[in-house]
């Protein structure tokens, strides 16, 4: 799967690069919204807590639903991995994919993130958010 480096606009506002802001980056990359706008929205939903050390799933879920995104589960407990971070196994379009301890943006088969999180296309996709 192809990979393009993108911090979602974080470097315009913050110097540190090794932070846990994958939810903010993935959403900014997928929506085209400004990093700081997404950061502030998630922080507000997270009771004022920073989004640079991880964002609770409930916060991300609430925000994305408010933005018109739909959750598509690709895995259920006990079923094993059915979909990997692999172009042939994902639909075309813009997706925010949920991986183990990570969110990333995939646009038409290309990963937009700060690193190639596909693990050579073996990484399991638990599900994805798509705008309907």
Where are these regions (language model features)?
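Noncatalytic regulatory segments and standalone regulatory/sensor domains
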Residues: 113-132
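Intrinsically disordered, low-complexity, compositionally biased regions/tails
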Residues: 12-13, 84, 131
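Active-site nucleophile-adjacent alpha helix/oxyanion-hole segment immediately C-terminal to the catalytic cysteine
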Residues: 1-52, 57-68
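Conserved active-site-adjacent core of cysteine acyl-enzyme catalytic domains
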Residues: 46-101, 107-116
């Amino acid at each position: 799967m192809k990979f393009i480096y993108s911090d979602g606009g974080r470097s315009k506002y913050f110097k540190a690069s090794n932070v846990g802001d994958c939810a903010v980056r993935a959403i900014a990359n997928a929506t085209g919204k400004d990093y700081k706008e997404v950061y502030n929205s998630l922080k507000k939903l997270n009771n004022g807590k920073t989004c640079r050390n991880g964002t609770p799933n409930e916060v991300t879920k609430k925000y994305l639903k408010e933005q018109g995104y739909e959750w598509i589960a690709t895995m259920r407990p006990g079923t094993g991995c059915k979909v990997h971070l692999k172009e042939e196994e994902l639909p075309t379009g813009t997706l925010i994919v949920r991986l183990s301890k990570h969110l990333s943006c995939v646009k038409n088969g290309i990963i937009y993130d700060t690193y190639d999180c596909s693990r050579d296309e073996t990484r399991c996709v638990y599900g994805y958010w798509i705008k309907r």
